[in-house]
From Swiss-Prot:
ATP binds at G161, E162, S163, G164, L165, G166, K167, S168. The Walker A ATP-binding motif also binds Pi and PPi. This is HPr kinase/phosphorylase. It comes from Paracidovorax citrulli (strain AAC00-1) (Acidovorax citrulli). PANTHER family: HPR KINASE_PHOSPHORYLASE, PROTEIN YJDM-RELATED. Pfam families: Hpr_kinase_C, Hpr_kinase_N. Catalyzes the ATP- as well as the pyrophosphate-dependent phosphorylation of a specific serine residue in HPr, a phosphocarrier protein of the phosphoenolpyruvate-dependent sugar phosphotransferase system (PTS). HprK/P also catalyzes the pyrophosphate-producing, inorganic phosphate-dependent dephosphorylation (phosphorolysis) of seryl-phosphorylated HPr (P-Ser-HPr). Residues 209-218 are annotated as: Important for the catalytic mechanism of both phosphorylation and dephosphorylation. The keyword Kinase applies. HAMAP family: HPr_kinase. SUPFAM superfamilies: HprK N-terminal domain-like, PEP carboxykinase-like. GO terms for biological process: regulation of carbohydrate metabolic process. Homohexamer. The gene is hprK.
Amino acid sequence: MKPNVVSADVLFEAFRSPLKWEWVAGLGASERRFDEVAVRSARSGADLVGYLNYIHPYRVQILGEREIAYLVNATPEDCKRRIARIVTLEPPVLVLADSQMAPDALLSMCERAQIPMFATHESSAFVIDVLRAYLSKHFADRITMHGVFMDILGLGVLITGESGLGKSELGLELISRGNGLVADDAVDFFRINQTTIEGKCPDLLQNLLEVRGIGLLDIRAIFGETAVRRKMRLRLIVHLVRKETLEREYERLPYEPLTQDVLGVPVLKVVIQVVAGRNIAVLVEAAVRNTILNLRGIDTYQEFVERHRRAMEQRDGS
């Protein structure tokens, strides 16, 4: 699900201090919003903000030094036409950057069309970077998943599995081994660009871990600030299963790495069988270390296949 609402006044207040901007025109349009169709079709926040461009409607139009020069350095008729064309773009907001002064005709147009216009001394490139990052997160596709999300050896790992397999207890043991908790039970994931999924904890569950028989534990209070994380990029899913499930649904040694689709992004996945006596925490850390090697281009399975092929060739040649 992708949220599709952010109004001009919300955007203004969010960056009143960072961008030190002023609301110079269109004060009566505080509820003006992004076009919902444009938001749904946008691949990321980068599609929703940019320099003044007449072929990209429905986005925040940034007016820097060059854009203002283009609007005013022409005959009076051309200036009027160029400024009037901005209305057809239906921008949610106009932003004057680079300490530029708005031409009177532009101010009048914003008042007539009720288009909010903000002005800042910051550079246009900086404004675009800041707004793109904000809009990418605000309008990101999102989903809530059940599991324990952790920082294990610097990698964002989601532990999933059937109920009663001890996911939270496993999380507690991993925390005691120096890893960090992001979220327990419910994890909010956001696709912030085409290949990146970021996860964080809902505010209501911040720092909390539920362990059966003990109850709710405040991990930050018990283990300290370094035992919790605000957010992490999802890089691996560890799925816990019972023996019969593993034998029925999964190969013992899969030829291709397993993946799971999360918001349209394939995420690496490993399956670990839960049996009495197994040290699951050690197995999870081993899976994470192996994933780190894979991300660096080191594939142990493919190296084994190549080693086996060479051995077969040597045997056939002898």
